Amino acid sequence: MSEFRTFVLCGLGNPGLRYAQTRHNLGFMLIDYVRYTFSFPEFLPKFSGLLSSGRVSSFLLYLFKPVAFMNNSGRPLVQLVNFYKVELENVIVFHDDIDLDFAKVKIKRGGGSGGHNGLKSLDFNLGRDYWRFRFGVGRGVGDPAEHVLSRFTALELERLNKLFGFIGTNLPLLLSDIATRKEKFLNEYKCCSQ
């Protein structure tokens, strides 16, 4: 019997319809996409969040959306990580980033919060040694807080769907890269996005 490597994929966002489809909820949107794409079961309430799990390739995945507001995302995630005894090197957090141009992505392990309140909460509760998958939403014009709480335009949603499609198709490659410290996923993404 083969052994599955376990990963937690956590999307950051705020609960409620008021925040649905906003830039700050991009992490929730991606987790929803992965659940749907890989036919994982419906989310169930657990650890002050919504949890689903399933297998993709040789990986067991826990998909998680903390339903505490963004500023308190760390507590629910640390409960899940401790309960399932998942190493931080196997935790990937998907979140918006105003310092990246729209639809640009960066992946790194560790680092600072960059002023992102969800990451501040994770760093405080969990430590910093998890993977961060940063999605660019740009700065917009005016107040950054208003920008991240604004909804995506139809054109932006179309571009996000293409990006999510790429991530869904290449999720096993992303997980394998993280497991083996290679960068095939990022190289594939760079080729695809040019």
Swiss-Prot record:
Keywords: Cytoplasm, Hydrolase, RNA-binding, tRNA-binding. InterPro entries: Pept_tRNA_hydro, Pept_tRNA_hydro_CS, Pept_tRNA_hydro_sf. It is found in: Cytoplasm. TRNA binds at residues 19, 69, 71, 117. Its EC number is 3.1.1.29. It catalyses: an N-acyl-L-alpha-aminoacyl-tRNA + H2O = an N-acyl-L-amino acid + a tRNA + H(+). NCBIfam families: pth. Hydrolyzes ribosome-free peptidyl-tRNAs (with 1 or more amino acids incorporated), which drop off the ribosome during protein synthesis, or as a result of ribosome stalling. Catalyzes the release of premature peptidyl moieties from peptidyl-tRNA molecules trapped in stalled 50S ribosomal subunits, and thus maintains levels of free tRNAs and 50S ribosomes. Belongs to the PTH family. This is Peptidyl-tRNA hydrolase. It comes from Neorickettsia sennetsu (strain ATCC VR-367 / Miyayama) (Ehrlichia sennetsu).
